Amino acid sequence: MNYLPPFENNFWTYLLIGACVFALIQLVYVFNFYLRLAYRRKSNDPQVSSFPPVSVIIAARNESDNLYENLPTILSQDYPEYEVIVVNNQSIDDSNWILTAFAQQFTQLKVVEISKSPHLKPGKKLPITLGIKAAKYEHLLLTDADCLPNSNQWIKQMMQQIKASQQLVIGYSPFIQTKGFLNKLIRFDNTWLSASAFAYALANFPFKANGRNLAYTRTLFQKVNGFKSHYAISPGDDDLLLQDAIKYSAVATGLSP
């Protein structure tokens, strides 16, 4: 009969206990963060009888096709008072012609032109800053030219989330479903990342925002000095701004794209 030393004899017991502890930690993690989404109350407050005026800001560069397809839906929102500011960032396509035509049809559309220059930094930070300067309202809602709201209630659903203590709202922005495995993979990754962002935000640990659907106030933008702390970095008009903003405001979530 072979003799097993005490440690080797108990190895599998220790391993099983370790696996159970690890599984328990994972369950606590899931319950503490991700289940917050399942029990999040949808904000459809019947007492909201009036909505603040809103400036929708879109930074666009060579987006003529997307502007032609998506801008009419944004300009036809069911919202009492809002303007749409498109910052045409050095475009060399037909964007100027399309925006001019839409501006004649929709009085709430304002166009800001940025002339082409080799000295301008890439990215959306300058266009967004110029759009905010041109905006006449306190509440700002940002999206991209290649994004299409799923209904004419988009602005209302985002503005329902803003409160005095929550001056920034991170919104959901799913990818459109098309054929192919790659699209499935992209949509899964985006959904998982969005769920993580919302779950952590609901737990008061926000770490990610998406510039395709993001709202905040002009006051908050000015408090963090805009993009000054990270202007040298091309990306970050959403995530890095969020990290500055949470020093001054709590974060709300808007799950309706």
Please report, for each region that a protein language model flagged, where it lies by residue.
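N-terminal membrane-anchoring/stem segments of glycan-assembly enzymes
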Residues: 1-49, 184-187
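Short, well-formed alpha-helical segments that are part of the catalytic scaffolds
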Residues: 39-42, 63-76
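Short beta-strand-to-loop acidic/aromatic patch adjacent to the donor-nucleotide binding site
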Residues: 137-148
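Acidic donor-binding segment of Leloir-type glycosyltransferases
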Residues: 71-118
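Long helical/loop segments within the catalytic core of UDP-sugar-dependent glycosyltransferases
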Residues: 33, 110-127, 131-133, 157-224, ...
